[in-house]
Structure formats: C-alpha cells, structure tokens
Amino acid sequence: MILEYQGLIIRLPNNRIKAADLTEETLRQILALGAQLERQAMRALPQDAMLAGGEMLQHRTLRTVLPYPLHRKLLESIQETYIAFAVSARPAPVNDRLPRLLMLDRQGSPDVPDAWNTYEEELLHLILTIRSQYAGTETH
C-alpha cells in the first residue's frame, strides 16, 4: 500500500500489481516538482532561519514551513522516496548545498535557478546510477 501511495507500483484491475515505469523524464519531473515546493518553502522561512543538520534533515525542515497540507504531503513523498534514496547513495555527505541555495535565494541572486537545476541533476544522476546498478545496465 505504501509503495502504491508513493507511485512505485500500480494496482491492476485484477488486483495484481506491477512496477511503475519510472523513466528518466518522469524522475526529472518528480525532482523538479520537489525543487519547486522546496523553493516555495525557502521563501516561507523566517529571515533569521538557518538550515542545519544533515542533508535529509534540511529537506525535512523545509517541508514543515509549507502552509498547505497537500504541498507538505507531496513534498514528503518526494523527499522520503526519491531524495532520500539519492542522498543515501552519496559516497560522502553533502550538508552545505541547501544552506547555499537558501543564501543565494535570500540575496536575490540570478544564479538560483541554475543552482537548483544543478542540484536536481546531481540527485537524478545518483538515482539513475543506483538504479542501473540494480538493473545491471550502464547510465551516463
């Protein structure tokens, strides 16, 4: 039931299930939606707020400030399913990325969209790399 809720499996009319077809484009769209919600959350943070702790704690902190429950639930699903998978695949922790994005956003930097895109691409690459290792295929 949890995997179905997360969109990882699809229940068929005969009550059987099959794995969802998670293409690179689908994963890209999911991460873009998560990034959009996290950018919205960054703007909702109090000016003196800081993002501390490990990378996943920082993501979870952002989720708590979203005012609309549906947005919080969507972001929770994206964070706990896809982002957590990518973060756990890192060879070493990266705990400064979200605080840097927050700083750029607060400064009104024109580099914010490119910085978010770079972060999304990094997460996507981690997901695709691990997925290809499980499937026994190569990824670029």
Task: Describe each region flagged by the PLM.
Residues 1-44, 128-140:
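Short linear motifs at protein or domain termini
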Residues 8, 49, 108-110:
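Residue-level recognition of short, well-ordered coil/turn positions
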Residues 8-11, 33, 37, 54, ...:
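Amphipathic, well-ordered alpha-helical segments in soluble domains
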Residues 12, 71-75, 112-114:
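Short, hydrophobic secondary-structure boundary micro-motifs
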Residues 24, 28, 52-108:
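Mid-protein regulatory/catalytic core that forms ligand/cofactor-binding pockets
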Residues 38-57:
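Helix-turn-helix/homeodomain-like alpha-helical modules used for DNA recognition
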Residues 40, 44, 61, 81, ...:
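Solvent-exposed, charged/polar functional surfaces in cytosolic regulatory/catalytic domains
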Residues 82-140:
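C-terminal all-alpha effector/ligand-binding and dimerization domain
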